[in-house]
A protein has these predicted regions:
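Residue-level signal for inorganic ion chemistry
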Residues: 29, 51, 104, 223, ...
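Short helix-loop capping/hinge segments that flank enzyme active sites or metal/cofactor-binding pockets
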Residues: 71-91, 250, 255-262, 315-386, ...
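Structural helix-boundary/capping segments
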Residues: 35, 164-270, 281-293, 360-390, ...
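Short alpha-helical scaffolding segments that buttress acidic/His motifs in well-ordered protein cores
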Residues: 25-29, 308-309, 355-363
Length: 487
């Protein structure tokens, strides 16, 4: 068996047992990258030299017994909106095409302390704005199951890299479904933790009240181990929460007897593909057969989530992206005689069309004549959505739903119709608006051989219940394969 067939936790155990080495694992991954990267475009930046150097140092620490954690020695890919000291960090945007941070994000630092080897930075929708990974300035990432299709977004490079075996696990960020939806499209596990669980320090912001960093992995066990490592209280992030229940691997228990699972009727109405509906409901049946109590219920306000989300996220983006002006770092337009001309040209040439669209939308909803009509109204809807979830979690331990209305669409199908792209987030964005944890894991394939994702949603700080439920389903489902050569 090749080390590429092992999960992250299995690989680390194999290294500690002397069956393989960190260097061998890194070289094996880079061989896979050389085989598949030209057709997939998962990475913006690769750092083979740095990875091999880290591998040597980490191997010595493992041999000396200094690194004993479940991820020690395991190669990881990092989404390109997470700062990595000395390694290009572009947000897949021309405007940051030459930006090399002088510091690393807290999540990356935590992984490095645990013995992770950074392979490189993964492709994404520009500034995490998109659902297909086609808005990248460095070209689209393609789905490893079928390269005519998108991998989802915005963490499409991370999801595709995990699914293709181009890394053992990856970090992504989730503002409205950007971990869970690509995980569903690529047939991997993706988790968005409760807001505040993982420090946002070093994450280049899109929507600060919605952004959260999380893992993409091959299975639930890896997901729990990664989340345990990256979760920490951080004084550098004022929204970081101090928790004493981050031993997430303790929730890897195959038992859902008596657990109450709610299925929101609102998520199974018009617009949901029949194959997706059938596979998700079949997964619910599996959990019911294992002893869970499964009931349908009404979760109101779902239809208002998309307009509320795109109002709030765009407003925050328009503010956050004001800092990219070509003055201190990033792309600067040439031949500008006046300062205002340099600002205008740098931003006009540096940002792509989707980013410009959201900046303009955000500026509009924050303008004096429309602030109350749009932005304040969206904040009220956000509060009502949180209240609706609170009422649901008074009755249920976990909510079970689809992750996306369809399987992965074809490349180019969403670019000409942004509304269609926005609607693909309909089942994920409410989780971000309410600050809740959610996990996506594969529950089958459609007739075209594309993965279907099951979404489980939990109450705030109840990641353990999600992990337990997901793990129990995964044990019944069996191992889900890596994507072989697409098409």
């Amino acid at each position: 068996m090749s080390c590429l067939d092992l999960s992250a936790v299995e690989l680390s155990a194999s290294i500690k047992e002397g069956k393989t080495t960190v260097k061998e694992a890194v070289e094996a991954v880079f061989s896979r990258i050389e085989e598949r990267e030209d057709s997939l475009n998962c990475y913006v930046t690769l750092d083979k030299e740095g990875a091999l150097k880290s591998a040597e140092q980490i191997q010595k620490k493992i041999d000396a017994g200094e690194l004993t954690g479940p991820l020690a020695g395991v190669p990881v890919a990092i989404k390109d909106n997470l700062c990595t000291e000395g390694l290009l960090t572009t947000c897949s945007s021309k405007i940051l095409g030459n930006f090399v941070p002088t510091y690393s994000s807290e999540a990356v630092i935590n992984l490095q302390k645990a013995g992770a080897v950074i392979l490189g930075k993964t492709n994404m929708d520009e500034f995490a704005m998109g659902s297909t990974s086609e808005t990248s300035a460095f070209g689209p990432t393609k789905n490893p199951w079928n390269t005519d299709h998108v991998p989802g977004g915005s963490s499409g490079g991370s999801a595709a890299a995990v699914a293709a075996g181009e890394c053992f696990y990856a970090l992504g960020s989730d503002t409205g479904g950007s971990i869970r939806q690509p995980a569903a499209y690529c047939g991997v596990v993706g988790m968005k933790p409760t807001y505040g669980t993982v420090s946002r320090y070093g994450l280049i912001a899109y929507g600060s009240s919605l952004d959260q960093i999380g893992p993409l992995s091959r299975n639930v066990s890896d997901c729990a181990a990664i989340l345990e490592v990256i979760s920490s209280h951080d004084k550098k992030d004022s929204t970081s929460v101090e928790r004493d229940d981050t031993d997430f691997t303790s929730a890897l228990v195959d038992d859902v007897k008596g657990m109450k699972i709610g299925i929101p009727r609102d998520y199974f109405k018009e617009g949901l593909d029949n194959e997706v509906r059938d596979k998700v409901l079949a997964a619910a049946k599996v959990l019911e057969e294992k002893g869970a109590i499964v009931e349908e219920f009404d979760l109101s306000l779902v239809e208002y989530a998309i307009p509320a989300y795109y109002t709030i996220a765009a407003a925050e983006a328009s503010s956050n992206l004001e800092r990219f002006d070509g003055v201190k770092y990033g792309f600067r337009a040439e031949d500008c005689e006046e300062l205002h001309q340099m600002y205008k040209r740098s931003r006009s040439q540096g940002f792509g069309p989707e980013v410009k669209r959201r900046i303009m939308l955000g500026s509009f909803v924050l303008s004096s004549g429309y602030y109350d009509a749009y932005y304040l109204k969206a904040l009220r809807v956000k509060a009502l959505i949180k209240k609706a979830f609170d009422e649901a979690f008074a009755k249920y331990d976990v909510i079970l739903a689809p992750c996306a209305p369809t399987t992965a669409p074809k490349l180019g199908a969403s670019l000409s119709d942004p509304i269609k792209m926005y609607l693909s987030d309909i089942y994920t964005i409410s989780v971000n608006l309410a600050g809740l944890p959610g996990i996506s894991l594969p529950c089958g394939m459609d007739k075209n051989g594309l993965p279907i994702g099951l979404q489980l949603i939990g109450d705030c700080f109840k990641e353990k219940k999600l992990i337990q439920t997901a793990y129990s389903y995964e044990q019944a489902r069996g191992a889900f394969p890596l994507a072989k050569e697409g098409k």
